[in-house]
Each structure stands twice: as C-alpha cells, then as structure tokens.
Amino acid sequence: LKYFIKSFLLFFIPITTLLANQKPYIVNFTRDRYHAANKNWSIGEDEKGVMYFGNDIGMLESDGMEWKLYTTPYSTLIRAVAVESHQTIYTGGSGELGRWDRDNTGRLVYTSLTSLLHDKQSLDSQSFWRIWIDGNNVYFQTFSHIYIYDHRTIRKLSLPNGFLLLQKVRNEFWVQEMFGSLYQLKNGILHKAQ
C-alpha cells in the first residue's frame, strides 16, 4: 500500500503541476493593430477560419495575421454580423442592413438591402442587434421589428411592444416580446409559446 501511495503521488503531482501551468493562448489586438474604432460589437467566423467583427466604423476581417477594414457607403457602424460563407456576410447597424459578397479579386463588396424595404424611414431610428441565418431566410432583428430577407424580398414582423434579443436555441429561434410573452420564430411566423 505504501508503494502504491508513493507511486501515485510521484505520478500525480508532476501531472497536476504541468496542467496547472497551462494557460490559454490569448492575444489581445489593440486598435492600433487593426486600425479601426476601439468598440467591436459582434463576431462571426467563416468555414476557412476567417473572423469578421462589427465595429463602430465598419466591418473588420482578419485571418489571424492581417486585418482589413470594410466600410459601408454611409460609414455606418456595424453592430451585427452573420456569416453565411466565406463568400457572403450579412451586417446590420444604425439604420442600415446589407450583405457583403466577394468579387473576383477576393475583396468584399457591400450591397445595401434597405431598398427592398417598403418603409425605409422607419429604419432611421433603429439599430440592428442580431442577425441569424436559417436556410434561405436571414433574420435581421431590431428592438422594434424582425426583418426577414429571403434573397429577393424583405418582410417585417412586429409585436405591439417590440422585441428583446432573438436567440437560437437547439436549432430553434426564440424571441421575447418586450415586457411580454415568449415566441418561437418558425418558417418566418411568430408562434406564442404555450
């Protein structure tokens, strides 16, 4: 028994010491390195490991070594990012929603989707906080509305008191009405939770 205890301690103590010294590899990138504003709102990653960040002055793209800043024509801040693929990224910010597609040189080119809205003036005071991709639908969420983009049109969902943040839980989309009930968003339709 003494031999077993000594052997166990001789084996266990060095391993716990090694494990205790392991620190996660974290790199802090300052704004001097990525050449944009200091506030980043959201993060997305594509299938190639390229990261995208919603920033106060545009969208940042980083492969871990290089940084690229993309701005919208109106230089709007970008609060929400959703990555469909390396070729297509959706963003939303203050009064603006759109998509970025890669051109033949690999650069991202912005297309505003606001022209698809019937009531563009309602966007003036709104900010997009969440974007989710669900098959052929893209959900853009403000506190007032959820906009559903189907690659051709945009339609708007509303509730009397507006929305809290739209969340994805186990491949289902859920949102709470501000000061109200919980709803499931399924196939572009809000269903009140029972």
Q: What do these predicted ranges mean?
A:
Residues 1-194:
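Carboxylate-rich, polar loop motifs that coordinate divalent cations or form catalytic acidic clusters
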